[in-house]
Amino acid sequence: MFNNITDDDRGQVGIGTLIVFIAMVLVAAIAAGVLVNTAGFLQATAEDAGEQSVNKVTNRVEVLNTHGTVGGEEDIDNITLTVRLAAGSDAVDMNETSIKYLSGDSVVTLTNQTVTSGANSATNDSAEGVADSDEFGLSEVTDDDGSFGVLNSMNDRYEVTIDTAAIETSDGDNTNLIGGLSTGEQVTLEITSRTGGTTQVILTMPQQLAGKTQNEPVEL
């Protein structure tokens, strides 16, 4: 009628409870380790993403001024931009910078093929050091430390030259030129550094070039 409870029975129940408790502790420890590792991975990933985002915003150039050069057909044959580092930017290597050129008739990505030929001078791979249909030219205005091609000081100034006459061609090369950018035409330039920082410039050609002579500079 009554169950007899012995000391042996109570001991077996105690051991079972202890085993379950130890197993729960081990599972909790493993789970905690996984959570710590996951949190560390997520933190590192977030830091990398944040650094990349900052670079895209800060590591870029600033365009100080622009002008065009009048061609022989009352158009703009060349565009020149004076650039420097944007505020807060780290060094920008113009040799690893690209420019997307977009007009009403043409779209092309330009790279810098300028090579140094001395401490503070440069010549372009193209004829007579002039940019062509897929390259932009680069020349020094000021460069305190002689590191031509790399903007690494707020005092550095370079001129970027884009040959619009070569780009706006009928056959995609430097033959059969049909002129540069016409009066009133608009062109968009996106200057992108190696880290992804982008500066956009939208330029509109003068509405009229009457009285302007060939090779005369005009403000854009």
Curated annotation (Swiss-Prot):
Please give the residues making up the propeptide in this record.
1-11
On the tree of life, the source organism's domain of life is: Archaea
Gene Ontology process terms (BP): archaeal or bacterial-type flagellum-dependent cell motility
Gene Ontology CC entries for this record? archaeal-type flagellum
Q: Which Pfam families match?
A: Arch_flagellin
Molecular function via GO:
structural molecule activity
Glycan attachment points? 78, 95, 112, 124
* Cystine bridges: none
Query: In the UniProt record for this chain, what is stated about the effect of gene disruption?
Result: Straight flagella, mainly at the poles. Cells lacking flgA2 but not flgA1 are hypermotile, display an increased number of flagella per cell, as well as an increased flagellum length. Cells lacking both flgA1 and flgA2 show defects in motility, whitout affecting surface adhesion ability.
Where is it predominantly found?
other
Post-translationally, this protein is described as follows, namely: Glycosylated by a pentasaccharide similar to the S-layer glycoprotein, probably comprising a hexose, 2 hexuronic acids, a methyl ester of a hexuronic acid and mannose.
InterPro entries per UniProt: Flagellin/pilin_N_arc, Flagellin_arc
Keyword entries, A-Z = Archaeal flagellum, Glycoprotein
Report the subcellular localization: Archaeal flagellum
Q: Which family does it belong to?
A: Belongs to the archaeal flagellin family.
Q: What does this protein do?
A: Flagellin that plays both structural and regulatory roles in flagella biosynthesis. Does not constitute a major flagellin in terms of abundance contrary to FlgA1: may regulate the flagella-dependent swimming motility depending on the relative abundance of FlgA1. Not involved in PibD-dependent surface adhesion.
The protein's name: Flagellin A2
Species source reads Haloferax volcanii (strain ATCC 29605 / DSM 3757 / JCM 8879 / NBRC 14742 / NCIMB 2012 / VKM B-1768 / DS2) (Halobacterium volcanii)
